[in-house]
């Protein structure tokens, strides 16, 4: 089976004593879970999904950058979101497909739009995490220390770190 093959391949790669080598079996769930690229206010008790934060680069941000924290997603594909609605069921198998959502802005005005949910928020959450760490280090050090996170041992990650060290953080300790 695939799991045993993964284990055998990992053992073989280990015998090569090669750094950063590996193999893993990826489990398939049979369905995809669409994501709108937002974090929701889990303390909110009313109808709809109250947005706590819109993730930069995510589907909501890319579709309408005017959507902000405090706005409420009232419906997805014509299904009103009540306080007891399972929000995950509304986006099941919707990743990559266009859906129609209705968003009530902080002003009380509702706005409808088509949006293409993503398959994951991993990249946006990672970028958010790095940005938060950069801001925290800058604040705590008074701008003396720069923060870089090495995402991977590849050329793109090296270039990103190198660019920050010689750019944004060139005057830092």
Each predicted region: which residue ranges?
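Extended, domain-scale alpha-helical bundle/helix-rich regions
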Residues: 3-8, 16
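Short, surface-exposed helix-loop/turn micro-motifs enriched in polar/charged residues
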Residues: 4, 62-65, 82-83
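Cleft-lining beta-strand/loop regions that shape enzyme active-site pockets
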Residues: 26, 50-53, 59, 74, ...
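Conserved catalytic motifs of ABC-family nucleotide-binding domains
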Residues: 70
């Amino acid at each position: 089976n695939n799991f045993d093959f993964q284990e055998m391949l990992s053992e073989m790669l280990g015998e090569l004593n090669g750094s950063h080598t590996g193999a893993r079996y990826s489990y398939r769930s049979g369905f995809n879970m669409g994501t709108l690229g937002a974090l929701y206010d889990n303390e909110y008790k009313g109808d709809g999904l109250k947005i706590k934060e819109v993730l930069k680069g995510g589907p909501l941000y890319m579709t309408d950058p005017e959507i902000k924290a405090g706005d409420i997603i009232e419906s997805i594909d014509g299904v009103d979101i009540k306080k007891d609605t399972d929000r995950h069921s509304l986006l099941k198998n919707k990743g990559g497909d266009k859906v129609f959502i209705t968003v009530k802005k902080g002003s009380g005005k509702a706005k409808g739009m088509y949006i293409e949910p993503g398959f994951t928020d991993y990249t946006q959450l990672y970028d958010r995490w790095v940005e938060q760490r950069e801001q925290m280090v800058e604040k705590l050090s008074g701008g003396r220390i720069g923060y870089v996170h090495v995402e991977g041992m590849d050329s793109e990650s090296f270039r990103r770190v190198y660019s920050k060290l010689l750019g944004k953080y060139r005057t830092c300790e």
